[in-house]
Amino acid sequence: PNFRAYLLEQGYIEEIGENGSRVVVTPAGRAATKIDCSRRGIASLAGIEYFPLLEELNCCMNMISTLDLTQNPRLVKLDCSGNCLKSLDVSHNSVLMELRCMLNELVALETDRNPKLTVLHCAFNRSLKALDVTGNPLLKELVCTENSLSSLDVSHNLELKKLMCGNGFVKKNRLETLD
């Protein structure tokens, strides 16, 4: 199973040429604002760049190790939880409001270019040592359990209603500061 097969299934692309050697994006694909390719054993989202109108992407519970969202500037919701991501660049997604990237292998996560972010779930990224949410003033929900954070500053997140940083966060990871 791969992303290309999913896109064919949805009617977002067509294979043309000898043995489907070329692919074209269909009108339905060009207009697509939502893609849910979760739980399909997909290892790569190569081709996601051909969907610039994309607002919602759910690619959770796959085997994705890299994710290039630089050509998806309208992305509002992203769930890439349960993959093999070591890095995630959301700096080109300035209207992103919900980011779920739990259960990956992230070592860093920068959200300073996502001022509209209201939901951030980044739990179970055991190598994640730093998280700066001071540039996310609209953040209402932050779940960052089971990481390696040593400090967390939420003093700028005045809208915060839900903060989950438990499950050994303080004891196991020696949390030094929580503002």
Provide a role label for each language-model segment:
Residues T33-C37, L57-C59, V76-C80, M97-C101, ...:
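Conserved hydrophobic beta-strand positions in leucine-rich repeat
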Residues P1-E56, P73, S94, P115, ...:
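N-terminal capping/linker segments that flank leucine-rich repeat
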